[in-house]
Amino acid sequence: MATSNQMGANTRSKKKKKNLKKALLGCPQKRGVCMRLLTRSPKKPNSAQRRVAKVRLSTKRVIFAHIPGEGHNLSPFSVVLVRGGNVRDLPGVRYKTIRGVKDLAPVLSRTNGRSKYGTKRPKVHT
């Protein structure tokens, strides 16, 4: 424990917070162009084929971004909007694409949790 003299002489230094979304340069989203589309298998207790896109951002950085939802219409050279947010069972994938913006179509079959997948509200006939 520090004495009161030591506390007055040396102020405590703040811990630096590590930025995990460096490629976005502090922005909420960035535009990018798909270079490659691939599937990755998740970490151990899980088993699936997760869709991942290799994206070159407008900042010239190349990242891997997860494509959420079932099915997608992306192809190489499609323009996407990328946000931060890691996929827990895919190591090294720290970004997600935003559905329903630019060239990435929304998940049309969704009825619940539509805002995360860019789906419009279905028309109700009365």
Swiss-Prot record:
GO cellular component terms, semicolon-separated: mitochondrion; small ribosomal subunit
Keywords assigned: Mitochondrion, Ribonucleoprotein, Ribosomal protein
Region ranges (Disordered): 1-21
Composition-biased stretches (Polar residues): 1-11
InterPro entries: NA-bd_OB-fold (IPR012340), Ribosomal_uS12 (IPR006032), Ribosomal_uS12_bac (IPR005679)
Compositional bias per record (Basic residues), positions renumbered to this chain: 12-21
UniProt-recorded name of the protein: Small ribosomal subunit protein uS12m
Organism: Bigelowiella natans (Pedinomonas minutissima)
